[in-house]
Amino acid sequence: MNLYDLRRTHFSSKTVDTLQKVSKLLPKDAIFVNIGAYMESSTACILYGRPDIVAYSIDIEQCQDGLDNLEKLGLSAVRLLGTSQDHGRKWDSEIDMVYIDGDHSYESVKEDIELWVPWVKKNGFIAFHDYGTPHTPGVAKAIDEFVEEYGYPLFLKDGWDEEDVLRIYRVG
């Protein structure tokens, strides 16, 4: 199995490449938090070729296929079971990148932003998945409000068809 095998499950090759670009910009021993781990595709993209990065994967239940994906690639992450909000309320250290792809309701995305964005270091990254997908309108609304409130510039985006699925912002 290689990293691009993941695209056949959840990610396009463009998404894999985009996350790999950002991974290379993270500092040595970076802290990465993945909200909504499921198949661990985003975690794998960030960790692949960067064994120094410490990854925390948050999800409400254990997905054995996701753990198997990481193991097959020789990667590992600290798995935190429960909601991102529960873990966010207890979190107490800075992070270099947060990837928000958990509960796709407007309220949950907004709460993830409120709980996790303050922990992102200057020059760190905030990534959102499923922006612009018709079945998750709350995601785009929460992200648009985030951009208006914080003013962080769009760093990278990608998508398929007419949808801008992945949006990454850099903390100024």
PLM region spans:
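A short alpha-helical cap/connector motif
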Residues: M1-G172
